[in-house]
Amino acid sequence: MRFAPSPGYVFLKEYPDEIIFQKIKTLKEEYIRRFECEPVSHRAARWGMNRTYFEQLDKNGILYDCSVTPLIDWTSARGYTENSCGPDYTDHPRKVYRVKGTGIIEIPMSVYMDHRFILNEGGNTSKKRNIKNFVRAVKGKKTLWLRPAGDNLIDLLYIVDQARKHHVDYLMFILHSSEMMPGGNPVFNTPERIEMLYENLEILFREISRDFEGISVADYGSMVGQKNLYVCSK
């Protein structure tokens, strides 16, 4: 490996193939030992996937992955070795697909473009802001995730509404366990913020439950795996 002058955090994909394989194998064996069941789904740290990583997951019997974030470019996230960075998923499929050359089914994160036009009233400043908002809405410059951020309940409900309108058959929700306790993360860092999170989740899940039901990545992957899915070589 050739190290960068001021390295960032390492991506697993930066290591040689054999080390990637052995790490996945070791973690899988430890998981089985502790929980007495075999893991079949995976998500990469920092969303850092590439072809080699997929191949090593496949060799270790992983069937489903959910690391792809459509519309998102992670190349600004530096790796540890020279010229290493995160992947660019801007043109990846937003629907479930098979990863070419492997037995893995990719279930991408729920990411949407925000085309809403929010009108501001009053004064020249608001007029300029309205023009800017309109351009952003038309071009779809803002991406929305189904991921709580403390002040984005309206965005989360918008995603659910868009999924319903476009007859999307799944929503991929993400929340780290560290985000469910005060002080475990910079966003929900107080008891009050945690309480607000749970209140928002109750509203969100109530809305989601109108058309969706909870299911694991493995169960959903097994269900859609019976279909004739698109094969992607990215």
Sequence positions of predicted segments:
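Flexible glycine/acidic-rich beta-alpha junction loops that bind and position SAM and/or redox cofactors
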Residues: 1-3, 74-78, 179-184
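Alpha-helical structural signal in soluble globular domains
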Residues: 30, 34, 56-60, 203-207, ...
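Metal-dependent polysaccharide deacetylase catalytic core of the NodB/CE4 family, i.e.
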Residues: 1-44, 48, 113
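Short loop/turn segments at strand-loop or loop-helix junctions that form parts
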Residues: 1, 107-112, 173-180
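C-terminal domain-boundary segment and adjacent tail
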Residues: 133-234
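The substrate-binding groove and active-site-proximal loops of carbohydrate-active enzymes
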Residues: 8-20, 38-44, 83, 142-151, ...
